[in-house]
Design a protein with these regions (language model features):
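Feature captures hydrophobic
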Residues: 302-303, 308-445
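Conserved hydrophobic/aromatic beta-strand scaffold that supports enzyme active sites
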Residues: 74-76, 175-177, 280, 370, ...
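Short helix/loop capping segments that flank catalytic or ligand/cofactor-binding pockets
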Residues: 85-87, 174, 188-189, 290-291, ...
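Catalytic cores of enzyme domains
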Residues: 58, 94-95, 100-285, 293-301
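Short, acidic Gly/Pro/Ser/Thr-rich loop/turn segments
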Residues: 82-84, 172, 185, 288, ...
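Short glycine/proline-enriched loop/turn "hinge" motifs that connect secondary-structure elements
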Residues: 65-70, 165-172, 393
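Short secondary-structure junctions
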Residues: 41-46, 121, 360-362
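Non-catalytic, usually N-terminal nucleic-acid engagement modules in DNA/RNA processing proteins
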Residues: 2-106, 110
């Protein structure tokens, strides 16, 4: 016969009180319409649900379950913005709209989480933007990709500008995700068309040429400029402060207005430097009529004020972005900065290469590079403006680079001299070394 020894906790008044209550049954199953109704009552403008097992969310599954192991369904929540605020050439107005809409969205997601809890369901709402898991920086700091979830939930399609375009509200939306511990009965009708109208205004408006007409996207160009006053730009500013000999050199590196702008972002939430691509987008049922009824007027009142705006544009020296702004926007002021993407591991270096690759310096030649750094291997092929990164060593290399991973990372970030690293046998480089110089120009720092 088993003797049950009472736990000290069993004598606690709260435990005793709960023991006397009738245990509640399982909560009622949730339907799509019920979730939508709760979301709208919380203040959402639209809402969709998608299973965490959806094939398009494979990359999201692990980080979502790490944050909320009970997650089974993701609820995508939409709050719309006021287009005229976002379009204003006074970018402080646009940034205030981003901040206000984002703040409202976090409140909506939190309220929805509370409503679901009242029905007996566990739910969690990560921030629509910040705070993030900065201990993981410069790796993945976000818990869930709100954009990816929204597309999988049939709330829109990804545009050329890499923002979700909602069929009704267009690009003027902010997104959040609520994680839910239950399956939801019912799914939204598939979105059968792309809300993008292929006007390419986002391509023409981007000051750094991050959006290419063929669908390509220069990630680093967007990050270096538009997100200048976020994590990486702030770090770059600190390095300028440390490296400057005196206040006069600091002023040569960082203007008074740039210092004030960074202070403003630190004090009143970070501000975007552009977001012109969203501002000029005419897509969406509620937005498109203005463009269709008066295209010249739309270009005159919305597009041209942003394109002709005198503003600093932050670019890495030798980058495609620098060449673009000098050729396309001579009225704008080029400001040189360090690359925002700096790898802290060999695997991170391999993953980041497609994000920082510059097509301009890669045109007109080709080469195959083998990397073997602390046992981490990769094959990199550059051919007339294109890049291919493969794990492992494949084919015949024109150049082989091997040795200590940290030494290579120090060379890439400018902390060490490559020649000295080779002389000290920290690195080994074999093959056509002239290609190494060409390789470096494709990844300016």
């Amino acid at each position: 016969m088993t003797t049950i020894i009472p736990s000290p906790m069993s004598e606690h008044p709260t435990v005793k009180a709960l023991a006397g209550r009738t245990r509640a049954g399982a909560p009622e199953p949730l339907t799509l319409e019920a979730v939508r109704r709760l979301a709208r009552l919380a203040g959402a403008d639209d809402c969709g649900v998608v299973s965490l097992d959806h094939p398009d969310l494979t990359e999201e599954r692990e980080p979502v379950l790490r944050a909320f192991p009970a997650a089974k369904t993701l609820v995508s929540v939409v709050v719309k913005m006021h287009p005229e605020n976002v379009r204003s050439p006074a970018r402080s107005v646009a940034n205030q709209e981003f901040h206000h809409a984002g703040g409202k969205l976090d409140e909506v997601a939190r309220a929805l989480t509370g409503s679901l809890a009242e029905l007996g369901h566990r739910a969690l709402n990560p921030a629509m933007a910040f705070p993030m898991e900065m201990d993981a920086f410069p790796g993945r700091t976000w818990i869930v990709s709100h954009k990816r979830v929204a597309v999988a939930a049939q709330l829109g399609r990804m545009g050329l500008h890499r923002s979700v375009i909602h069929p009704r509200f267009g690009s003027f939306i902010v997104l959040a995700t609520v994680m839910l511990d239950a399956e939801v009965v019912g799914r939204a009708e598939p979105l059968t068309f792309d809300p993008c109208v292929s006007c390419k205004l986002c391509v023409a408006a981007c000051p750094v040429g991050a959006i290419e007409p063929d669908g390509g996207f220069r990630f680093s160009a967007c990050l270096d400029h538009n997100y200048r006053e976020f994590m990486t730009g702030f770090g770059d500013l600190l390095e300028d402060v440390v490296e400057s000999r005196d206040k006069h050199e600091l002023r040569e590196r960082v203007s008074i207005s740039e210092s004030a702008s960074m202070w403003q972002s630190l004090a009143y939430k970070p501000n975007y430097k552009a977001a012109h691509c969203i501002a000029v987008c005419p897509a969406g049922e509620e937005v498109l009529p203005q463009f269709l009824s008066d295209r010249p007027g739309f270009l005159r009142e919305v597009f041209k004020p942003l394109v002709h705006r005198d503003e600093p544009v932050f670019v890495v020296p030798g980058s495609d972005a620098e060449a673009h702004v000098k050729q396309r926007f001579p009225n704008k002021t080029v400001r040189h900065v360090r690359s925002s993407l700096r790898s802290t591991s060999v695997e991170g270096f391999f993953r980041a290469m497609p994000l920082v690759f510059q097509r301009g310096p890669a045109r007109g030649w080709k080469g195959t590079f083998h990397f073997d750094l602390d046992g981490h291997t990769a094959t990199v092929r550059i051919a007339d403006g294109t890049l291919e990164v493969l794990r492992g060593l494949e084919g015949t290399a024109d150049v082989t680079i091997s040795g200590e991973g940290q030494t290579w990372l120090d060379v890439v970030t400018g902390k060490r001299n490559a020649v000295l690293a080779v002389l000290k046998r920290k690195l080994r480089i074999s093959g056509d070394r002239s290609l190494v110089t060409r390789f470096a120009k494709c990844f300016p720092r």
